Regions:
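Short beta-strand "wing" residues that participate in macromolecule-binding interfaces
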Residues: 70-71
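Long, low-complexity, charged/polar intrinsically disordered regions in eukaryotic proteins
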Residues: 1-13
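Glycine-centered, phosphate/nucleic-acid-interacting loop/turn motifs that mediate DNA/RNA or nucleotide
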Residues: 67
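Helix-to-catalytic-loop junction in kinase catalytic cores
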Residues: 64
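N-terminal helix-turn-helix DNA-binding core of bacterial DNA-binding proteins
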Residues: 13-21, 25-54, 75-84
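Short, hydrophobic-biased segments on the C-terminal half of alpha helices
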Residues: 60-61
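Conserved segment of winged-helix/HTH DNA-binding domains
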Residues: 36, 78-105
Length: 105
């Protein structure tokens, strides 16, 4: 009996990681707000995401590591260039899936 596991598919691993990152309701609300197109500071995102600024800072680090958001001048956060929303916002094309961010988590 061969018990060796097949090598994991790299895109499947990325999707699994993204699913883990996006599973958090605060991160979902942050992405939904950023999908509207504005670059925002942590304190504004904290209010919009109904969380504290220190917690949102930690969430932003996770989203940055996943490549979903970028930080610019003045520590303003926005969606990473590859994930800019379509006109009207609330929709992000991640390549292997499209997120509709117009729903509450």
């Amino acid at each position: 009996m061969n018990t060796a596991a097949a090598a994991p598919n790299p895109s499947a691993l990325k999707l699994k990681h993204l699913a883990t990152v996006l599973h958090d309701p605060v991160r979902w609300r942050i992405l939904r707000e950023l999908s509207k197109g504005d670059a925002l500071p942590v304190w504004v995102l904290a209010g919009l995401a109904r969380s504290s600024a220190p917690k949102v800072s930690k969430h932003m680090a996770v989203l940055r590591k996943a490549g979903l958001v970028a930080v610019g001048y003045g520590r303003l956060y926005k969606l990473a260039p590859g994930f800019q929303p379509e006109a009207g916002g609330a929709r992000l094309d991640l390549g292997h899936c499209v997120l509709k961010l117009d729903t509450e988590f």
